[in-house]
Amino acid sequence: MKSCAVSLTTAAVAFGDEAKKMAEGKASRESEEESVSLTVEEREALGGMDSRLFGFVRLHEDGARTKTLLGKAVRCYESLILKAEGKVESDFFCQLGHFNLLLEDYSKALSAYQRYYSLQADYWKNAAFLYGLGLVYFYYNAFHWAIKAFQDVLYVDPSFCRAKEIHLRLGLMFKVNTDYKSSLKHFQLALIDCNPCTLSNAEIQFHIAHLYETQRKYHSAKEAYEQLLQTENLPAQVKATVLQQLGWMHHNMDLVGDKATKESYAIQYLQKSLEADPNSGQSWYFLGRCYSSIGKVQDAFISYRQSIDKSEASADTWCSIGVLYQQQNQPMDALQAYICAVQLDHGHAAAWMDLGTLYESCNQPQDAIKCYLNAARSKRCSNTSTLAARIKFLQNGSDNWNGGQSLSHHPVQQVYSLCLTPQKLQHLEQLRANRDNLNPAQKHQLEQLESQFVLMQQMRHKEVAQVRTTGIHNGAITDSSLPTNSVSNRQPHGALTRVSSVSQPGVRPACVEKLLSSGAFSAGCIPCGTSKILGSTDTILLGSNCIAGSESNGNVPYLQQNTHTLPHNHTDLNSSTEEPWRKQLSNSAQGLHKSQSSCLSGPNEEQPLFSTGSAQYHQATSTGIKKANEHLTLPSNSVPQGDADSHLSCHTATSGGQQGIMFTKESKPSKNRSLVPETSRHTGDTSNGCADVKGLSNHVHQLIADAVSSPNHGDSPNLLIADNPQLSALLIGKANGNVGTGTCDKVNNIHPAVHTKTDHSVASSPSSAISTATPSPKSTEQRSINSVTSLNSPHSGLHTVNGEGLGKSQSSTKVDLPLASHRSTSQILPSMSVSICPSSTEVLKACRNPGKNGLSNSCILLDKCPPPRPPTSPYPPLPKDKLNPPTPSIYLENKRDAFFPPLHQFCTNPKNPVTVIRGLAGALKLDLGLFSTKTLVEANNEHMVEVRTQLLQPADENWDPTGTKKIWRCESNRSHTTIAKYAQYQASSFQESLREENEKRTQHKDHSDNESTSSENSGRRRKGPFKTIKFGTNIDLSDNKKWKLQLHELTKLPAFARVVSAGNLLTHVGHTILGMNTVQLYMKVPGSRTPGHQENNNFCSVNINIGPGDCEWFVVPEDYWGVLNDFCEKNNLNFLMSSWWPNLEDLYEANVPVYRFIQRPGDLVWINAGTVHWVQAVGWCNNIAWNVGPLTACQYKLAVERYEWNKLKSVKSPVPMVHLSWNMARNIKVSDPKLFEMIKYCLLKILKQYQTLREALVAAGKEVIWHGRTNDEPAHYCSICEVEVFNLLFVTNESNTQKTYIVHCHDCARKTSKSLENFVVLEQYKMEDLIQVYDQFTLALSLSSSS
């Protein structure tokens, strides 16, 4: 890889030269300059330092010398840059970014990386830069951009030495984004890598087990946890966390066994967990939940008390305590506990509903209504309709209620309002520190805050004195079985963290003091305001669960005197969690606020910077596990999605338990260590496994960010270099004054992944180089010099640097880049000008120097190509009246029309994204009955059918399961059955529909009534619940013996649409690709959906409707797939792998044209290359489909682009493009110059790579064994990363002996075994054979030119 290290010798010389030019009289200035000069030894030590050492370099204790050296280097670089007015080599900024990153000065690192990105056109070649940039994004929780940066690293350098760290972070971030399949894949890739990592394999295995848990795969999770417990020398903290998770799963999840048995196991596991880590507040809390569920009230209270003593107060814990008090007929204590809960988390829906229930039972409907309204405002209360009905009921009947007197000895509003929020306390400290410089308004504000603070202290002492002896009554338990769901049953989230052994004094609500001073709880130091994170740095964070916004004043009404008990209201009410906070991380939801003592947003914001999941004001007091002299934060949160009954019905709390799984590696052990953060874990029956990824750094640090914060924070601290304004301005660039202001919309813009499409096809795609041999980086990388400071306008054009054009700013003196002995040798050197004209002899001669000629990856196009990017929306945008274009359709009257050559040309024309050929079956006399359900059952009734369970919805709409809002995610769960069983379902569905129609006819007498009822039914469909349907899909008809008649019938089609033909690229693959060069069948009932997608590798497709019903199609041209990809990312969906159904309103607003048409029986739909489409059945019907690859430059280009995009996204390409390209060269005479150039260059590239790798293996003493290849042998893919492996197969010794041949690519083999001692290298093609194919593949003369 290309190094970004600046020659420190050159830097020192340049610095010295500048010093000589200074006036002799400025001795003090010269002395200052000499103080930051670097010695030869220092330059050598710094020569090998870049982002790859992040997390591995020690800066404290014995590493203090390194920290000092890095600080000195930063000052030297800053001084040099300042003197040169920013006109220095771009690599200076990159190295400055690395040094600041290693010093964990993320804002400075970000500024320097920004500058390097704006100056370096081919920044993407620098893997160390991309990695460092990804780490900064990761630190700031800008996961959308961190993912892109890390994927770029793996794309340009798959053998990157920190690939394991990247896969680990990608796994965590995809878990946050609920892309569980991708998350699991990256965790597994991290697990097989033998390179050093900041987490142990046991810790990674824990993440995998927890990932299963978050997907509700409880049995798989249980097996994974139990298997992890069998690991030898398992760290105590990992063991404690695993036992904690197992205990909670037995209590809360649907595991085998009766309730008593599961509770018994749960208690045993939790007790064992506490033996391993007695200071885990979370385990104590879970134990309290278990005791509560079996009626052991005193034990439950003791456990809750321990939880509060061991960790900071959480809203969930206080809500659970309130429920127990309520059960014991202690309404006043219950009231105080609920008040504590809502003070700690004003959005705690369950606590508000519990409080409302309490007021209802005491005949205070108006107060109950206020609480219910607060609950309804919470994002975590999804079932607002039931709650609204309850509020309406109380409003209508409140006049009949009898009021009583308050049980409270003091106004609850007073308690609530006197608790200063952490923001106000911080603001008070700031005002006190600047007392002498305040204006009159600020002085008045200071007086008010000080007065309120004194009253709060007085109230606290008064309450402690009043209730010192208050406790739990020892009377009979009114309900021997306390509610098991006294807090929401959301799955908690295993977390690997540590709690500070010395809690810092903090501010807590007065009611907390009161209840802690009662007989049931000790009045120990239980801060809810601050926590000290263990580690070498004393970072003090204000806890996010002590938030009591000023808007809440007066929202907690008085509790009137009433002697009634507190009955359970058995009103079903769901209070599920809020939408996952990750949705706000994508495009400008994060503020980049960070101060030395607090991460709060500022005095004007009531919420902390970052909410980890459904517990929006989540307690963030976690650290982690002792490791070898390094600190690592590896959070992992649970963002529950399941519904949980509220306390209005059975006391279920809903504050989401988001826990950060954080390992802390340090040199000194701590007494109090917990792998689970002591946070609110009112968790529910599911866990969305959201990883609160706060930093994976070599120091413990946390960023509490606000998931719903405004994109622009005017009062946020500046992220620039505050101690050097001049340097700050230089690093920003004088033309860009808004860089680094602490807002996420600025941060998002820094990433080099701005979508751009130039005239050279897709500029950001490797295939942009297809038409030109060696394009200039400037032409293909125009986006790199777009304004890097405002992603709000990513296409703001070129900007100047220091008043000059970019070209001038880059004309500074170039310096040599020294390499330390341990520096990666995978340099990216300037690519040679490559032509497709040279013979194979010249090609091989040019690459006789293994490892020294370009990229190490297997990109089959130009070395100069950056990682691929989706295209932006075409410009100018279409007018609104052009967004519903007519669908290109052709009507066939006879067989001659079907074979008319212009039909083929019309279908394959790139200007036609889709073509509907009407009447094809009739014109060709196709016997569609061969594909009818009846015939299929008669032919092979036990044939396997993949079944997708879906919700019946209108074709142009897609609602969430509750029917409350339109979404992109399309529910489609997979299972399997047989043709016979699905045929039975298909028939019964039809019969049921007939019965429903008959019932409608008998019930309604006139047409108007029918219309009214139809309208009502339509409205109900949108409100849910929706009817469940089953769609039979992907039925394989490839077996010629089983489906001979059906496959023979399809030979009647014209050649361009046939499954097998000489002009079909997929025919030349040489082996079967199910569903692509074979036929697949689909069996449908009304509403069956094929979600949005592009065909595999962007190949064309043919689809024929067998009937008897119709299908409705929605089609978007290929040019707009980037827009749909962006929509998917905004909705936390994977464009390639997820199931999604576009919202037509969103597409209309984005000016995306949509073709919409009906496919009738006998119609053939031709989907052109790259076209995006989704389909819904209107009636009962069957369809058949397959893919076709026209022999055109457009098809090949789009196929290669998707091949590279799949590689970037770690998705397997079903079509092996390298293998296919060599077969095309053998079998096809190509007359199209563009297509010929693309294929020829692919061959050249692969030939170079093969020669280079083979020579490197021979030079290393690794034997290459001839293996050969059978005729129909499929192309090979790496069993680890799933990239295509051509010719040289790395096979494990064991599989080679057993003849199973488990193939690895070279990079994965090296990661598994650095010296390849466990692998055998098999060769499938002789070099002579490939040389012959390459030389003989020449441009054929077309018929027109020859004539």
From Swiss-Prot:
Its cofactor is L-ascorbate; Fe(2+). It holds the Pfam family JmjC. Residues 761-779 have a biased composition (Low complexity). One of its GO terms (molecular function) is RNA polymerase II cis-regulatory region sequence-specific DNA binding. The modification Phosphothreonine is found at residue 887. Its EC number is 1.14.11.68. Keywords: Chromatin regulator, Dioxygenase, Iron, Metal-binding, Nucleus, Oxidoreductase, Phosphoprotein, Repeat, TPR repeat, Zinc. This is Histone demethylase UTY.
